[in-house]
Amino acid sequence: MTAPTTMTFFERFETDILSGKKTITIRDESERNYQPGSVVEVSTLEQGRVFCNLKIISVEPILFYDLGEFHAQQENMTLDVLKDVIQDIYPGISQLYVVSYELV
């Protein structure tokens, strides 16, 4: 499968990404093919507005129940909020992927 060259985020996460407070994203199986070392163009999900480029550092599988405070800190939110957000986006999911990145 070809590695993706784009990534989208809800607009509400843009400021945290640009400030470096949000350094991971947690995605489902359909978005697990990002390649470490690649650079992706990032846009808002709502309007498709490009706002930065990110270098992918790693893509690691994780189960929903294994998410912890460290992941929440990297997402710049509390663990309870992180779990609620994930359940809103991916209801009932157990297998997830942590995509680590840095702003370029």
Curated annotation (Swiss-Prot):
Keywords: Hydrolase. InterPro entries: AC4CH (IPR008314), ASCH_domain (IPR007374), PUA-like_sf (IPR015947). Its EC number is 3.5.1.135. It catalyses: N(4)-acetylcytidine + H2O = cytidine + acetate + H(+); N(4)-acetyl-2'-deoxycytidine + H2O = 2'-deoxycytidine + acetate + H(+); N(4)-acetylcytosine + H2O = cytosine + acetate + H(+). GO terms for cellular component: cytosol. The active site is at K22 (proton acceptor), T25 (nucleophile), E75 (proton donor). GO terms for molecular function: hydrolase activity, acting on carbon-nitrogen (but not peptide) bonds, in linear amidines; N4-acetylcytidine amidohydrolase activity. It comes from the Bacteria. Residues 7-95 form the ASCH domain. SMART domains: ASCH. Belongs to the N(4)-acetylcytidine amidohydrolase family. Catalyzes the hydrolysis of N(4)-acetylcytidine (ac4C). This is N(4)-acetylcytidine amidohydrolase.
